[in-house]
Amino acid sequence: MKFGIHIGISQSYFDPKLISEIAYQAEISGWEGFFVTDSLYGSHESVPVCDPWVALSAIAVKTKKIKIGPMICAIPRRRPWKLARETVSLDILSEGRLILGVGLGSPAKEDFERFGEEPDNRKRADKLDESLEILVGLWSGKPFSYNGNIFKIQESTFLPKPVQTPRIPIWVAGEWPNKRPFRRAAMWDGVYPIYDTGNHEPGLTPQILETIMKDIKSRRALGGHFDVIVEGKTPSNDKSGSSDIIDAYHAAGATWWLEWIFPARGTLEQNLKRIREGPPTLK
């Protein structure tokens, strides 16, 4: 099992320099991944928000080995050919450390409808699926054309290719019990299940994860490694208590634990303290 940080880059975490320093502290403290939110406006008005690609670029320069990426990239409000350029550039800058977390993006009303973007989940899902096909085609470094219901691309060759082979890993987010996101996730490299409890904090239980894993396994035709990402909070200075929490998720099939580091969890100093204590360990 691997351990990373999932940080909300808004409110007191809006400065790319600060975010990159936190990522550096995570790396030297033993965490293996550092993932940032992708929010355009969010659910609160007049809150400072950082652009994820600027933050990730700063992180890539500041760190050496920690995996990085958006968690999750709201692909339906992006042009996939522009995203192809951005992701390859970041993969090169980070020397092959990028993981692309993808999903519909939320909240739909504030991050989409407010700015004249399509808020409907089904239509955004169609856009996401076509965008993923385009990304992989443009990452190939070979002549690629596309004729979808939404996007049309004349034959084009994008160079350079990503550092990673065969391509940049793709993790797909989905809110359980909706089934379409998990059908989508089974086609790619990992799943990031979300279970909304209504309080804006992680609510996925090991029991729910077991049910999700059965669903994923029934759909997954591809071989090879498949990541299962869960997030939550482990207590400070309590290795035994932390192990009790993550052991249950590991037994249910999780391959990554992401520590939830958001302003709602505590002050900057409190959250930095938890990061510097390092990741939890399995029993």
Please annotate each region the language model reported.
Residues 1-283:
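Active-site-adjacent structural elements that line small-molecule/cofactor binding pockets in enzymes
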